[in-house]
């Protein structure tokens, strides 16, 4: 059960959204990226839709909009290696839907259970286990000016002695160019808004019962992707991204006296990533482009034992004790290409960092009131206590507790509450004393003569960063009324106070005047030019001079600088988010079949950032490029015999376009998805069709364009930025998909 390390308990304390493989099929979900993009609690700032060169085709999970690095992603309950240019997030795009049994989304802080990163929540992808037979999948999808294809094969065997499952999937996507959509036709050609991708994925899961009470288990995965996109905003650049990930787990479980069970396992996860940015040598001062590469590795040894402690009148008190030793390392570097597209061997932005982590954890579940001692007003009462202590070799220790209370005053009503502390260790890439570049800016400064000054600004990392910390609490109510036993309604309130966040306090650019202004940055009015030269040497790059477009028409030199603006990463930012989640399901018989209704909605009451205690609070919800205040997904699925159909809607509420002068309202966006399935069951269909399931899915049935936002045009070079919010909208339009799934033998 995601959210607890104790076997055999019904984890009702923290809210968990569970989506089964059957539901994924009904909704026509073709990839894990599609799943998280439609999740109302997720904010899509890292996805294929962004068209970001550094992560083309990658998909990260960003619960509550607190950043992909603040959501822990697990595969079968274990960590994956980080990906991206700085190892800043876990790329889930390589996990095929065909290999999944279910997806659990825990929308609560969980560092007491899982350790670092579980601040906004946890997403746990659970692989299929008990399956007999073979399954072949083929899917083709079409949208205007683009096609995608998927083929997959799964083999499984399950007996009393053990089980094994092997799954492979290949996918190909043509991508999408800006000139293929009316709302981006003004972009300079060529320009890619969705990358072209090809991907291979393979997964294995197995277990063997050596004797009664002794089992060995293993799982393994491999994924490789190639993505291509063209960026022509500043200069023509073909970006080719080639990530590869692999890993596995080997362990054993043994039954102990008294109903206890012990587990020992070792796991490893690796992620390699290369980005080749090819330019036209004659138009780029540094030649033919650049390459960025990094490798992230995680290996761990885990031991735990859980079982019953003693009995109370309300039930059995259960506990788990465990320990973990983990090693992580990160290595990354960049280099330029010459006119022949060969490496110049002029490495810059080097990063090579490693650390080890030792952890101890414990958890106790105590049912105080149960069926045997229920009373009026207290039908059930239980508490959960958990704590995890971690010792990091690079920044120190962290102790994170969590407490949960669950109370049922009526058989149909359950009230729950949690409180806990969580943390996030700094990224290894952040702890390298590295300067990415040094910029020279025309800076708005009210304390300088004329209200402006020439500033030199180092941008990069620092090695003295500390861990980020958070306190979170939630309360909720679950309702299953006796008069409607098929109704299951859950509502939760969440509140996360997130301090010491690592970030770059970068200045903002005023697009009206192309001037930079404080947002907020530590400014040194007296500085040593030798320190600036040290920053330049660390970067390995020439000075990045932005004063070529200064309002007075003068391009300044480094010697003209009168300010040093320190834009290196700091631990000064704080964030706070609060809101409501609603999850409702209701099933009923209809027309000799079954109708299932569902709604999942998320509403932000507030979300705010503060870059330091001396700076004003910035609202970060209901504005462009930030989480929408309200998102919801709901629909109806009806099935009868071999046939099923469903209609789902996805809604994003209206929000503010703060770029417009004056600010304006961006309209809400509502899409409809329709699917139809027919299953040729064995014994009721010709042999060739027996075990075949046909699925037709239409996403965005009415081909609705994303809401328009104000188009930003740089006055000097005509560069254009997307006229839609890629974090809150999707440029694909209507997508029609046909899938054929065939089962061979088994069950």
Where are each of the predicted segments found?
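N-terminal periplasmic accessory domains that precede
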Residues: 32-35, 39, 59-62, 91-93, ...
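Transmembrane beta-barrel wall of Gram-negative outer-membrane proteins
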Residues: 132-135, 143-261, 266-268, 381-384
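Short, acidic, small-residue-rich periplasmic hinge/interaction motif at the N-terminus
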Residues: 1-25, 33
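Extracytoplasmic beta-strand/coil segments of soluble accessory domains associated
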Residues: 8, 36-79
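Short acidic/polar hinge/loop motifs at secondary-structure boundaries
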Residues: 78-107
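C-terminal beta-signal and adjacent terminal beta-strands/loops
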Residues: 497-499, 605-608, 650-656, 679-747
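Short loop/turn motifs that connect adjacent beta-strands in outer-membrane beta-barrel proteins
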Residues: 130-133, 160-161, 210-214, 257-261, ...
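Outer-membrane beta-barrel transmembrane domain signature of Gram-negative proteins
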Residues: 283-380, 609-635, 648
């Amino acid at each position: 059960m995601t959210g607890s390390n104790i076997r055999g308990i019904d984890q009702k304390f923290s809210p968990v959204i569970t989506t089964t493989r059957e539901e994924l099929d009904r909704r026509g979900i073709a990839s894990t990226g599609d799943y998280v993009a439609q999740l109302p609690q997720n904010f899509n700032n890292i996805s294929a839709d962004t068209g970001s060169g550094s992560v083309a085709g990658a998909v990260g999970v960003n619960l509550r909009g607190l950043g992909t690095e603040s959501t822990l992603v697990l595969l079968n309950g274990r960590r994956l290696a980080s990906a991206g240019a700085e190892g800043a997030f876990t790329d889930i795009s390589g996990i095929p839907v065909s290999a999944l049994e279910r997806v659990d989304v825990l929308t609560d802080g969980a560092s007491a259970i899982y350790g670092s990163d579980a601040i906004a929540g946890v997403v746990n992808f659970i692989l299929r286990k008990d399956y007999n037979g073979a399954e072949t999948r083929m899917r083709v999808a079409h949208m205007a000016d683009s096609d995608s294809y998927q083929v997959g094969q799964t083999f499984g065997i399950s007996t009393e002695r053990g089980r094994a499952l092997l799954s492979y999937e290949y996918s190909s996507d043509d991508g999408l160019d800006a000139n293929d959509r009316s709302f981006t036709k003004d972009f300079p050609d060529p320009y890619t808004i969705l990358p072209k991708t090809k991907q291979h994925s393979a997964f294995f899961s197995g277990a063997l019962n050596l004797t009664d009470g002794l089992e060995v288990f293993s799982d393994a995965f491999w994924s490789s992707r190639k993505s291509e996109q063209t960026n022509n905003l500043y200069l023509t650049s073909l970006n080719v991204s080639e990530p590869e990930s692999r890993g596995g787990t080997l362990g054993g479980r043994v039954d102990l006296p008294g109903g206890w069970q012990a587990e020992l396992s070792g796991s490893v996860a690796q992620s390699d990533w290369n980005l080749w940015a090819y330019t036209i040598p004659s138009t780029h001062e540094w030649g033919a482009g650049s390459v960025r590469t990094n490798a992230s590795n995680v290996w761990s040894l885990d031991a735990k034992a859980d079982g019953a402690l003693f009995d109370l009148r309300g039930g059995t008190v259960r506990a788990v004790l465990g320990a973990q030793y983990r090693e992580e390392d990160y290595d990354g570097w960049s280099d330029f290409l010459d006119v022949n597209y060969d490496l110049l061997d002029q490495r810059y932005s080097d990063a090579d960092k490693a650390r080890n982590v030792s952890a101890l954890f414990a958890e106790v579940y105590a049912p105080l009131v149960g069926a045997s001692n229920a009373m009026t007003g207290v039908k059930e009462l239980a508490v959960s206590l958990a704590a995890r202590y971690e010792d990091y070799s690079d920044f120190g220790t962290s102790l994170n507790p969590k407490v949960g209370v669950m109370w049922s005053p009526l058989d149909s009503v359950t009230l729950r509450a949690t409180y806990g502390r969580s943390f996030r260790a700094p990224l290894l890439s952040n702890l390298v004393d590295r300067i990415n570049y040094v910029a020279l800016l025309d800076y708005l400064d009210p304390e300088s003569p004329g209200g402006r000054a020439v500033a030199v600004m180092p941008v990069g990392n620092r090695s003295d960063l500390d861990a980020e910390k958070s306190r979170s609490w939630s309360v909720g109510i679950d309702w299953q009324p006796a008069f409607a036993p098929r109704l299951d309604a859950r509502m939760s309130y969440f509140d996360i106070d997130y301090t010491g966040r690592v970030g770059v306090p970068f200045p903002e650019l005023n697009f009206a005047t192309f001037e930079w202004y404080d947002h907020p940055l530590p400014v040194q009015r007296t500085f040593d030019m030798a320190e600036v030269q040290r920053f330049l040497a660390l970067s390995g790059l020439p000075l990045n001079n932005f004063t070529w477009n200064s309002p007075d028409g003068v391009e300044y030199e480094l010697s003209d600088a009168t300010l040093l603006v320190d834009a290196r990463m700091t631990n000064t930012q704080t964030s706070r988010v609060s809101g409501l989640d609603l999850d409702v399901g209701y099933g009923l018989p209809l027309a000799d079949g079954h109708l299932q209704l569902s709604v999942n909605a998320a509403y932000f009451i507030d979300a705010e950032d503060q870059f330091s205690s001396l700076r004003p609070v910035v609202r970060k919800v209901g504005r462009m490029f930030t989480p929408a205040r309200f998102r919801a997904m709901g629909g109806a699925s009806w099935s009868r015999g071999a046939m099923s159909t469903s209609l789902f809607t996805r809604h994003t509420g209206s929000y503010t376009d703060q770029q417009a002068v004056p600010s304006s309202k961006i309209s809400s966006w509502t899409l409809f998805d329709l699917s139809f399935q027919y299953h040729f069951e064995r014994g009721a269909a010709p042999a060739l069709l027996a075990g075949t399931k046909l699925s037709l899915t239409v996403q965005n049935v009415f081909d609705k364009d994303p809401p328009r936002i104000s188009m930003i045009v740089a006055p000097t070079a005509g560069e254009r930025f997307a006229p839609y919010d890629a974090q809150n909208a999707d440029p694909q339009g209507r997508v029609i998909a046909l899938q054929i799934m065939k089962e061979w033998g088994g069950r």
